[in-house]
């Protein structure tokens, strides 16, 4: 597939469209040019055309066959190789068999016959000739053949020649020196010898391609020769005897001159009436629009006819009788008048450049000065008028355009008449030198030639002017596009800046939040430290209170008014060397602390306020405290055991069966107590059956030695002095405490005299006494 495949497909679709009413030769020629100049490969082009030939629509197939015919005739050997082969011939035969459209069948037969005649001398294309003969034998009727239809004289670009050195300067090719081929001659050249670019019309190459210097000079010389010959007379006229004759027009008689004058007068009158009507119309328009008042001054410029004035126009009235349509442009008086106006205001025949109006005010001419000094209105039509010169002012109304159209129409009629007269003379064999009509037509056409050139120049100038405007519009469009791009870029920058600012703000907020979190953590840590410090201080205060309580307890224990048996027992060991640990909490003298009581409770401090008895009936002997082997105990009055037992039973808790069943008798004496103890108190060796009232009853100590009995107790206790009163027996639990807590507010009980037991009392009395005694 070539580089121009897209263009080729578009042109092929256009040339084979089913909507066409006739063959589109322009598209077909462009297809041929694409194949000839190498933009589209021949194989690809022929295959695409074959697809169109096999289309179901007969119109598309017929136009595709037209394209194939033109391609074969104009594109040379590369296309011949693709068409004149067995495959293509078989496809055409199959298409002919299944095609029912008469025009398509006739076109296929016509192409096969023409190709067979054209390639009859080419051995490699013999398959076309064989196909033609076979189809004739099969009975196909071929259309009438013309030899001119088989003229394949198309020139194609030569094949490229490969060599190792330049064809002109003989420089060897290498890494630095590259190979280049000339598209005109096909030879190989170096870069210096093939640096020119040119078009090659004979090969159908309409774009500039690389050619060598000799081919470039040859092609340009031909182009210059053709350009120079266009300005000269045609060769038919130069070779004819007419060019040898005098070019002076023949004299006319008086009648022709009079008719010419009358015709010119009528034309002048009609022209003046038209100008007057136009002037009135413009005046009414200017009064309605006062801003455009300077415009009537510009109307004084020479009209369209004066712009085409030329010294050659003196011969124009001679052709008046030949073509009446040229009378308006060949009016002698009219043109003389316009020439005088042109001499008064020297307007050049060429278009006024865009820079000249700036220098015109200094010349003192009224018409150009009025155009330059006139203020520019707000509309866009006036700047074009002031810049384009008088020619553009003629297009402000429709008169000039109409006159130009009439001029062109008249000139076309004259040329067609001239050509027909020449052809008629040629067909009849008459000489054009003897035909006065041909001579007069030639003179009239020659006289209008300068006007035609002037009109072409003006049109070309306007075309350049509008192309310049289009370029400016394109520049403005590009500038607007660039401005839009800059604005978009600016908006993008602003958006990015806003996003960056937002991102920075988010980062700052995140940093602030992190700082606040750290401060919060520090604050919580400080609060926790403060709480821990307060707890430590409270713990220290509690420890200090405990220390103070311990000191207070120790001080109370050391005070003589509050003897504590537990402290004494801890300080003074027994005679046997055994130190007994107290099993219950420290009890203050004169207090009652049941189990589960708390310091400061009413039960704890109710007895603290009760004063203990100041003096006992039996003061302690001084000798007893000095003896270390003697156990110091509370000295209970021996004569009043019954009086103290009753308050103890009432004050103590009633849950203890021992206290509830114990009813002391008023008769004092150890014997009675000993005799009643086994009935009311449990044995010492047995565990108490009461609830947790005292520490001794709730926590019985498991001693590692043998329990006390009467024999061990008698051996353990020191000798008792006969002068001391008998100690009150200890009852299990907190009975000594209850005995100490006896109310002292009541009337003093009369203690009966204690009967001393006889010294020869038996052991049973001692056993009963032993059960009533307990050591703290």
From Swiss-Prot:
All copies of the VHS domain together span: 15-143
**Modifications the protein undergoes after translation, according to the UniProt entry:** Phosphorylated on Tyr-334. This phosphorylation occurs in response to EGF. A minor site of phosphorylation on Tyr-329 is detected. Protein phosphorylation may also be triggered in response to IL-2, GM-CSF and HGF. Ubiquitinated by ITCH.
Region ranges (Disordered): 223-319, 338-401, 719-776
Question: What Gene Ontology terms for biological process does this UniProt record contain?
Answer: endocytic recycling; endosome to lysosome transport; membrane invagination; negative regulation of angiogenesis; negative regulation of platelet-derived growth factor receptor signaling pathway; negative regulation of receptor signaling pathway via JAK-STAT; negative regulation of vascular endothelial growth factor receptor signaling pathway; positive regulation of exosomal secretion
Task: Tell me which tissues or organs this protein is expressed in.
Answer: Ubiquitously expressed.
Q: Where is this region: Interaction with NF2?
A: 479-776
Name the residues that bind Zn(2+) 2.
182, 185, 212, 215
Write out the biased-composition intervals (Low complexity). 294-311
Residues carrying N6-succinyllysine: 550
The chain positions of domain UIM read 258-277
Q: Which GO terms describe its cellular component?
A: cytoplasm; early endosome; early endosome membrane; endosome; ESCRT-0 complex; multivesicular body membrane; secretory granule
- Which superkingdom, per the lineage? Eukaryota
Zinc fingers (FYVE-type) at which residues?
Answer: 160-220
**Which residues lie within the region annotated Interaction with SNAP25 and TRAK2?**
444-542
N6-acetyllysine sites (modified residues): 207
Q: What does this protein do?
A: Involved in intracellular signal transduction mediated by cytokines and growth factors. When associated with STAM, it suppresses DNA signaling upon stimulation by IL-2 and GM-CSF. Could be a direct effector of PI3-kinase in vesicular pathway via early endosomes and may regulate trafficking to early and late endosomes by recruiting clathrin. May concentrate ubiquitinated receptors within clathrin-coated regions. Involved in down-regulation of receptor tyrosine kinase via multivesicular body (MVBs) when complexed with STAM (ESCRT-0 complex).
The name this protein carries in UniProt is Hepatocyte growth factor-regulated tyrosine kinase substrate
Q: Which organism is it from?
A: Rattus norvegicus
Identify the gene encoding this protein: Hgs
